[in-house]
Amino acid sequence: MKIVVLGAGVLGVTSAWYLAKAGHEVTVIDRQEGPALETSFANAGEISPGYSSPWAAPGVPLKALKWMFQRHAPLVVQPRLDWQRVSWMARMLANCTSSAYAVNKSRMVRLAEYSRDCLGELRAETGIRYDERTQGTLQVFRKQQQLDAAGKDIEVLRADGVPFEVLDRDGCVAAEPGLAGSAERIVGGLRLPGDETGDCFLFTNRLAEMATEAGVTFRWGVSIEALEAEGGRISAVRTDKGRLTADRYVLAMGSYSPRMVRHLGLKLPVYPLKGYSLTIDIQDESRAPVSTVMDETYKVAITRLGDRIRVGGLAEIAGYDLSLNPRRKETLAKSVGELFGGAGDAEQALFWTGLRPMTPDGTPIVGATPIPNLYLNTGHGTLGWTMSAGSGRLIADLISGRKPDIAAEDLGYARYMRGAKAAGRPALQPARA
């Protein structure tokens, strides 16, 4: 079949790769001049199935109120009247129950574990390299209360069969020797030996090169204007360079996905969650991390990428604003400075921001839609890199009529359709001219 993939971030490129490997004729279109130049450009770098957790969790509403008065809060809500934001936040708060958290985390871990396996197979098959390391990840706790609260996550990990190690202070330093100078700040940690790290931008670019060799066509600098519909199906993609037609369409445009389908009657509950990162050149390797260290206090990941350190995280609800907030840079620098002081100079770092496409329940939307020839691969939030290979393969299997290797019914748009049907919303409307 002829397939058009909208978006060339890591989700779009992995989708294109697996679709091409399944024998389809694939074209990818993106407004940028190359792959992974938006949200996939400088993310935190960790591939962490075990840490795949929804932001909607018990206790988060109370924590959010406390964070409002902290200078270095992990979550910031910029004041602005926005109905889409209000609706999304209300749905997120509704998922902050213990029962919802357990369900959401379990299915996120399912997809993330599968994705890591797919990535390993892809690496073995192609020899692709992207500053990857397979040395696990370590979540460090500065307070005993944080360590105690991790018990709920540990229960889910145990139920899902994910290997883990609960470490004391000395165990954390043994796993990450660079923490020796800051050991007094740590009370313990949770290590997941099966997790990985890698440069998402480097991976996406190299996979795009391989996809091109496999027959995929990439069209750069093409702005997508609208999806056109006729007879209950997508008939074309309208761009500033003309119309493209295909048998199937895959929407992988991250936070911008809802804008592409709203006029078709699809109400995607995806909202941008702004994140930040610093990329620091290593000056003292003995003080640098070996893999990824998650700072639970600031919700920051500190990742080793070759001869660089990527410090990424935080969450800012600010709509589609991409301006750089200097206070967020202070928070990232504070986290890495306190845990890995002297490893590099944060003042000379590359400061970046991107928009993560977040769903209220944390689980991405991967699969079919009520429109027969339109598929979604979006809403991965902070876990797009972690879930990319598995999501791309899942989309290819669904389009190709193959049974997926994992349960996928609860990963798609259908879980959000009950409310839409109750409200009497149409499943498909003609595209506006």
From Swiss-Prot:
Source organism, top-level taxon: Bacteria
Annotated organism of origin: Paracoccus denitrificans (strain Pd 1222)
Descriptive protein name: D-amino acid dehydrogenase
The entry's keywords: FAD, Flavoprotein, Oxidoreductase
Pfam families: DAO (PF01266)
One of the GO biological process terms: D-alanine catabolic process
Function: Oxidative deamination of D-amino acids.
Associated pathway: Amino-acid degradation; D-alanine degradation; NH(3) and pyruvate from D-alanine: step 1/1
